[in-house]
Every structure is written in C-alpha cells, then in structure tokens.
C-alpha cells in the first residue's frame, strides 16, 4: 500500500481518500466487483460513523470508474480538523482506512441498493446530452468505446447480477486485496503513523492514439427540442505542469466559469445559443466545447466556434479573473476525497507540488495562453438532437 501525505494548514478540514487500481482485460466484466465495492464502502461508512461519530462519516463518498483498460475504485471522507473536534481520534481513523476490512457476504437488500445506485448513475450520464455527446465524440475519435460511453457502465450487465452471487464474497475480497491500493491524506496532519507504507504510487495512464481527426456524427433523440453540439480539440503533448495550467486557463477564458468569450462571440454574430459549456478532459487530453442551440442553427455553430478559437484573445483583467477562478476550483477540489485523489495524480504526473501549481498559475501571461492555443487542433464534432 502507498500512503501519500500532503501537509498543509490551508484548510480547516482533513480529506482522506483510499483507492484501488486494477488493470482489466477488454472482455472483463467489472460490474460485479463494482456492486461489491459499493456495498463494502457503505458498510465502511457505517463502521466509521459508529466508531468515530457522525461528523467523521457524514461526508463519506465512494465511486468506481473505468478508465480505458483500468478500473479505479475510490472511497473517502472529509472531516473537520481534530483541533476543532477533541473527540476525534485521527490516527485511529486513518488506520481504519489503511486496514480496511470487507464484509464476507452481502445481504440481498445491500446488493439491490448498490445496483439501484449504480443504475441511476449510469442513466443520468446517458440522459445528460452534454456528457453523452462528449463521450461519443471521444470514442469516435479514438475508435474505442472505452474512451467514451463504455466508461458510463453497462446497464444490462448490472441488471442481470443476482444477489446470490455475493453470499460468499471471498473471491471479491481476495481480488481487492491484490489490487494496487493507495491512501491519500491532505490537511494539517503532523504524521501518518501507518506501518509498511511506501510513498511511490502509480497513476491512471493510457496510450492515446487518435484514429479519426474528421469526426462528425449526428444522433436524433427527438425531432423537437434543441440540439447539443460538442466540438473537440486535441491538446497535443502535455510536457509539464505549465502546459496543464495554460489549457485550464484557456478553458476558463472560453467559458468554463460563465464569463464566456464564446457567448460574447455568438452575441456579436447575432446567433442565439441557449448554453455554452467548455471543459478540459485530462484523461483524453481534449478541450471540449458544447453548445446548446436550436436545431435550425446546427450548421452555423462549428465554423463560429472554430473562428472564436482561432481568433482567441484575452486581456490582463480577463486572465486574472480566470486565474482566480482556477485557484478557487483547485483548492475546492483538493478539499474533497475525490478531488484530492485526482490532483494527487496530477502532482505525480508532473512531479510538482500543490504550491508549484499555485505559483505556476500566477506566472502565466496573456502571451503564454495565446501561444499555447495555436497548438491545439480541431478533431471533429458530435451532435445530439432533441
């Protein structure tokens, strides 16, 4: 097990995130393991509340996600620092995560609850036209559903799972214990007295090979209603943390936080759009721009977005605003179990510290972002009608 301790006095809370990383074969069926992990994590949450009080477990979270040929399962909690809660024994709580115990069997009710939770999560992702369109664009560009909608999960496999499969959970426990486990802790923690820990960890990685740079797919859910168009831009090779910061700031300047350069561009062109969402997908290394508009304007949108990106500009005031939004978002993410896990992966990937990222944000100039945006390349679009 790897233990990563990120000491900081910046927060009045402590975030703890445990994760399990498992390579899977393309034909593997991780759904059963996900059901077991959801139930086991719910069991751990109750154990923590019983042992350490409601405040230690009320913000407990868990998730299981597929990333290409790997499955990442996460559980964790965020709690008020012990200096504000004298009854909390932090060392014992951290040890509980380090020595996580798993139930030897699951009740039918626990299995059905986990199934329902997972199915609802999948349905929400497929129903959200922005998430769906972005996933379809990625899988077409990379020629593999594992880069897109397959990451959402497979409803038919989950629905077919029977509770009897979990009456004896020995094989699930053995499998979990054999996976690469890491424990990430952020906060003002003096020490992490967990024997046998190592500091070196592995990150979720994948080989990216674009097989199609001329994607244009259209799917019709309904003849009525608006359309959602998602345009993708390949961001090339991320050489260091500076490149990561630049693309995040470009994302913010284009429209991630609401003060949207794209909305302004559409207004100037007298083209009404309902919604604009931009986001940088770090797993696929794509900048995604999603526009919700009337079906009548579908064909007008892509050239306008390309024009806005190719003529991208930003002044000092706009850049400073984007920087502050990005700092706030980053610190908010760090102060949560899932966000902590994600950013620990970024710190490892670029061999930097949290302070390096914050300093790097301050150092970026308008010229830097203007130069960087010229290196990204349009790969295509996906349209969902209705």
UniProtKB/Swiss-Prot annotation:
GO terms for biological process: bacteriocin biosynthetic process. It comes from Bacillus subtilis. Pfam families: Peptidase_M16_C. Disulfide bonds: none annotated. The keyword Nucleotidyltransferase does not apply. One of its GO terms (molecular function) is metal ion binding. InterPro entries: Metalloenz_LuxS/M16, Peptidase_M16_C. This is Antilisterial bacteriocin subtilosin biosynthesis protein AlbE. The keyword Nucleotidyltransferase does not apply. The lineage of its organism: Bacteria, Bacillati, Bacillota, Bacilli, Bacillales. Keywords: Antibiotic biosynthesis, Bacteriocin biosynthesis. Involved in the production of the bacteriocin subtilosin.
């Amino acid at each position: 097990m790897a233990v990563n301790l990120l000491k900081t006095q910046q927060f009045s809370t402590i975030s703890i995130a445990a994760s399990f990383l498992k390579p899977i074969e393309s034909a593997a069926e991780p759904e059963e393991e996900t059901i077991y992990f959801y139930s086991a994590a719910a069991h751990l949450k109750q154990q923590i509340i019983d042992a350490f009080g409601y405040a230690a477990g009320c913000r407990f979270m868990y998730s299981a996600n597929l990333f290409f040929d790997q499955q990442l399962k996460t559980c964790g909690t965020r709690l008020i620092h012990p200096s504000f809660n004298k009854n909390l024994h932090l060392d014992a709580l951290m040890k509980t995560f380090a020595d996580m115990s798993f139930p030897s069997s699951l009740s039918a009710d626990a299995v059905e609850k986990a199934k329902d939770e997972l199915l609802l999560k999948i349905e929400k992702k497929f129903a959200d036209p922005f998430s769906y369109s972005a996933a379809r664009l990625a899988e077409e560009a990379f020629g593999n559903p594992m880069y897109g909608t397959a990451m959402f999960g497979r409803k038919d496999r989950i629905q077919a799972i029977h509770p009897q499969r979990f009456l004896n959970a020995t094989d699930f426990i053995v499998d979990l214990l054999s996976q690469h486990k890491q424990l990430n802790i952020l906060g003002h923690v003096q020490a992490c007295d967990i024997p046998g820990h190592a500091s070196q960890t592995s990150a979720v990685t994948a080989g990216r090979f674009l097989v199609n740079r001329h994607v244009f797919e259209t799917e019709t859910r309904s003849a009525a209603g608006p359309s959602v168009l998602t345009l993708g831009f390949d961001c090339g090779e991320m050489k260091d943390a500076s490149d990561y910061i630049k693309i995040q700031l470009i994302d913010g300047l284009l429209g991630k936080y609401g003060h949207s350069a794209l909305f302004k561009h559409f207004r100037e062109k007298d083209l009404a759009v309902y919604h604009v969402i931009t986001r940088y997908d770090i797993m696929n290394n794509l900048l995604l721009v999603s526009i919700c508009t009337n079906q009548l304007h579908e064909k007008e949108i892509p050239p306008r977005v390309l024009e806005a990106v190719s003529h991208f500009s930003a002044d000092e005031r706009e850049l400073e605003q984007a920087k502050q939004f990005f700092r706030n978002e980053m610190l908010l993410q760090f102060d949560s179990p899932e966000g902590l896990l994600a950013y620990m992966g970024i710190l490892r990937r670029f061999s930097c510290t949290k302070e390096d990222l914050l300093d790097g944000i301050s150092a970026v100039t308008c010229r830097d972002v203007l130069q960087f945006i010229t290196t990204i390349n349009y790969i295509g679009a996906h349209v969902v009608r209705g």
